[in-house]
Structures are given as structure tokens and as C-alpha cells.
Amino acid sequence: MFMGEFRHNIDTKGRMIVPSKLREELGEQFVLTRGLDGCLFGYPMKEWANLETKLNDMPLAKKDARTFVRFFYSAATECELDKQGRINIPSTLRNYAALTKECVVIGVSNRIEIWDEARWQEFSEVAAENFDEIAENMIDFGL
């Protein structure tokens, strides 16, 4: 399970060190793709396979399902850690998530998320302001 918040930098070649606390669970190879809310999602290969099964079961006749699957898969890329524990984030993904230099990597249960630091700060502030109300709404999901 992934959890925690880690601050890292992306170098001029688009490389970022994956936090050591997340590396073992993530594995040497994993999939990185567009996420929601303007961040990137990173999945261990096993989790990606589980997600693939669910995505492939989506109804092809539904336009939203087709759009989501296309957008999600078209940016997906297999990443491999180098000897220094870094990954190279493709420019298309860096542009999507507005990643320049300072970023935040967070663990979110079965995946990691990579955020531009300013975007994460803004998201966190809004989430903190509304956390009690959001928590109350989670009752509908059995929490």
C-alpha cells in the first residue's frame, strides 16, 4: 500500500527520483499515465493489469467510456527505475501535469500520484477547507 507525501525535483532531462519508501512496492517497472485533477498516476504492473481488466470491460458503445479509455491509455508509458532510483517522465506527461522542477509524490493506496508542487498546494488547501464536509459525504460509500 502506498502512503505519504514526498517533495522532489525534476531535472532538466525530465528525470525524477522516486521516493525510496515507494520504490519497493512500485517495482523496477511500472506504468505512468495521465491522472485526474491534473496529476499523473503511477501503477505497479500488477495493479495496472487489474485496472486494464476493468477498463476493457467498459461499454464500448458509451462515448464517455471510449473517451476516458482513449485519453488514459494514449499517454500510458512503462517506466523503469535507473540505478539511482530515477524515472524519466515523458514530456507529454510533464506538460499535462504542468511539471517543471518542484513536484510532490504522494502515495494513494494502490498507486502513486505525481503533482506539480503549486498545483498540489492549491488542491490540498481546498481539500483541507472542505475535509469535514467531504468526510460526511463518504458515509454514502460505507466509510
Curated annotation (Swiss-Prot):
Q: Name one GO cellular component term.
A: nucleoid
Question: What Gene Ontology terms for biological process does this UniProt record contain?
Answer: negative regulation of DNA-templated transcription initiation
Q: Transcription as a keyword?
A: yes
* Chief place where the protein resides: cytoplasm
Q: Where are the transmembrane segments?
A: none
Q: Which UniProt keywords apply?
A: Cytoplasm, DNA-binding, Repeat, Transcription, Transcription regulation
Which molecular-function annotations from GO does this UniProt entry contain?
A: DNA-binding transcription factor activity; transcription cis-regulatory region binding
Superkingdom, taxonomy of origin: Bacteria
A Pfam match is MraZ
The SpoVT-AbrB domain sits at 5-47, 76-119
Q: Where in the cell is it found?
A: Cytoplasm, Nucleoid
Quaternary structure, from the entry: Forms oligomers.
Listed name of the protein: Transcriptional regulator MraZ
| Species per Swiss-Prot/TrEMBL record | Enterococcus hirae
